[in-house]
Amino acid sequence: MQVLVRDNNVDQAMKALKKKLQREGVFREMKLRNFYEKPSEKRAREKAEAIRRARKLARKRAQREAGIVTAKK
C-alpha cells in the first residue's frame, strides 16, 4: 500500500495510510489473527456478524421506507 508524502508532511501521510488500512480491514484482521480462534468460535463469530449485518440492513430499509412515506404527505 502506498501513500504520497507531499511537502514533507509526514503526519498527513500517516493519517492517509491509517485511513486506507482501516478501510481495507487490516487492523481488524491483525486483531483476529493475534490469537488462535477455534473453528467453532469462528463459525459463531461469523454467524453473529451476519445477524448484525442483516439487522442493520433491515433497519436502514425501514428508515428509508418511513422517510419515503412521510415525504409523500
From Swiss-Prot:
Keywords: Ribonucleoprotein, Ribosomal protein. The keyword Transport does not apply. It comes from the Bacteria. Disulfide bonds: none annotated. One of its GO terms (molecular function) is structural constituent of ribosome. The keyword Lipid metabolism does not apply. This is Small ribosomal subunit protein bS21. It comes from Parvibaculum lavamentivorans (strain DS-1 / DSM 13023 / NCIMB 13966). The lineage of its organism: Bacteria, Pseudomonadati, Pseudomonadota, Alphaproteobacteria, Hyphomicrobiales. The gene is rpsU.
